[in-house]
Amino acid sequence: MKRVLLLSSLCAALSFGLAVSGVAADGAALYKSCIGCHGADGSKAAMGSAKPVKGQGAEELYKKMKGYADGSYGGERKAMMTNAVKKYSDEELKALADYMSKL
């Protein structure tokens, strides 16, 4: 009986984990943490000098965020963006880039 209960619990836990990981990243929800610097509609020049995200394509935005994450992109003040994007998965960065490209 204990073995059946243990096996059932394990299966339930694995099923829950698969269901959670299968949820698509929500670019709009992720963008909420970007509004302070980039503005609600993406038209704000972050730190007074960055190109607004509004009007940029998804692929361009994705490449820039990946570059910030790995240190290959950005100017003197890239530390803030590097720290901001490092926490996101590749799927989340793509969802975020897709959302921003539609602002």
Swiss-Prot record:
Post-translational modification: Binds 1 heme c group covalently per subunit.
Localization per record: Periplasm
InterPro entries assigned to the protein according to its UniProt record, in alphabetical order: Cyt_c-like_dom, Cyt_c-like_dom_sf
Main subcellular localisation: periplasm
Signal keyword on record: yes
SUPFAM superfamilies cross-referenced by the UniProt entry: Cytochrome c
Keywords: Electron transport, Heme, Iron, Metal-binding, Periplasm, Signal, Transport
GO cellular component: periplasmic space
Keyword flag Heme: yes
Gene Ontology MF terms: electron transfer activity; heme binding; metal ion binding
Amino-acid positions noted as binding heme c in the UniProt annotation, renumbered to this chain: C34, C37, H38, M81
Signal sequence, renumbered to the chain: 1-24
Pfam family membership, one: Cytochrom_C
Function: Natural electron acceptor for a formate dehydrogenase.
Protein's name according to its UniProt entry: Cytochrome c-553
Annotated source species: Nitratidesulfovibrio vulgaris (strain ATCC 29579 / DSM 644 / CCUG 34227 / NCIMB 8303 / VKM B-1760 / Hildenborough) (Desulfovibrio vulgaris)
Lineage start: Bacteria, Pseudomonadati, Thermodesulfobacteriota, Desulfovibrionia, Desulfovibrionales
The encoding gene: cyf
